Amino acid sequence: QLPVLQAAPQLKDPAHFRFLSIQNQGGTRATIDAARPVLRELAETANRVRRVAVPASKLVIGLQCGGSDGLSGITANPALGVASDLVVAQGGTTILSETSEIYGAEHLLTGRATPEVAEQLMERIRWWEDYAARFGGNMDNNPSPGNKRGGLTTILEKSLGAVAKGGSAPLTAVYRYADPIRQPGFVFMDSPGYDPCSVTGQVASGANMIVFTTGRGSVSGYRPVPCLKLASNNDLWSRMGEDMDINCGDILDGVSLQDKGAEIYRAILDVASGQPTKSEAQGFGRVEFV
């Protein structure tokens, strides 16, 4: 399998993809010894890489929420939707996912899409309905115990908040899980509702940053890319400020969604320019990525 992967046309420079086999090298210690010079060579190559300025159109943002509460759909999620629109306006890409968590609110997406794209989204929803039914479940059972303790009681409430992350830009494409994103704009990638699995697909599709809203206090990170955390309420911000990047609870105190969305967009640019996120500073992200 590894030789096939090394020969994949998607690899810009196959020479940077190296692998050693314990069986072929003659044991564990021999493999470690053989790996040392290879790692030195790769480190020298990596050290020659320099950051260069690129336009905001290069941004590919995975939109995520986890540990949502009753305020997520009022504060953090719609504010992220404003930021999503700003990214798209600059020629960038934002990816909404978690198909089981838009259930009941899909009309808010299909109404912003061409008939062809709308049908692609509905086909994915029908697949998930069938999948749940085959295993004796139903799509209405999605809200977790934590969601319910936070004030979300039905999938419809949760879905309305989840869709708000997508702002108001037209839905330009629907992708299968982990398929490469081929065009900019606001797009949807089919995925389960489980955050690590969904983020894995988004990163495989081309996301270079995750922006993640939470009301209950998720501290997950996703090591291949930075993860910017948005708190939905002031209480979470006051208790877990060391893990949250932006407080969206002040929207309830009068800060407008437009101003908060602009703040999130500026933070996205800062992180893309090298500023570490809180989850990176805390060392999260080694195990959350599938």
Could you tell me what each predicted segment is?
Residues Q1-M209, R216-V290:
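Metallocofactor- and cofactor-centric catalytic cores in central/energy metabolism, strongly enriched
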